[in-house]
């Protein structure tokens, strides 16, 4: 399914399908189920999206505020905007990979994997320990009161 303009209804659900959003808008409460692939290069998917055992690739446009993943879902962000205020809640078994774009908020519970590729990472204004040369990686645990900032690759 290709969406390049106009408005798709709220509550739209896809199962095991590929959807490409290059313009226009998909209303709130969008659901991608069981092996679906959602490719967003422009346009937007409204708030409260629910991604279940599926993949979202965001390289442009906007992906819904207050959205969540369940099961073995994967979120790949190389551009665009993820969330506005409440961002994304990554459920157990989920994976998120960030190499670009803007991430407003991310909640990642136990059993999740988050990879952020870039440089100049600071945690509450201090350099992240262990990131001294290109290719270094570090496991970082921080609270909701702390900010992680950096330049995404």
Segments predicted by a language model, with ranges:
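The right-handed parallel beta-helix/beta-solenoid scaffold, focusing on the short coil/turn
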Residues: 1, 6, 10, 17-19, ...
């Amino acid at each position: 399914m290709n969406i390049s303009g106009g408005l798709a209804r709220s509550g739209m659900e896809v199962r095991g399908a590929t959807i490409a959003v290059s313009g226009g808008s998909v209303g709130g409460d969008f659901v991608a189920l069981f092996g679906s692939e959602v490719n967003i290069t422009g346009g937007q998917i409204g708030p409260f999206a629910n991604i279940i055992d599926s993949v979202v690739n965001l390289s442009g446009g906007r992906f819904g505020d207050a959205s969540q993943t369940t099961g073995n879902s994967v979120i790949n962000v190389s551009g665009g905007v993820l969330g506005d205020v409440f961002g994304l809640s990554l459920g157990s078994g989920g994976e998120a990979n960030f190499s670009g774009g803007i991430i407003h908020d991310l909640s990642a519970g136990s059993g999740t994997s988050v990879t952020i590729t870039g440089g100049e990472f600071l945690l509450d204004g201090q350099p992240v320990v262990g990131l001294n040369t290109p290719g270094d990686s570090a496991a970082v645990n921080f609270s909701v009161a702390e900010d992680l900032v950096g330049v995404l690759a």
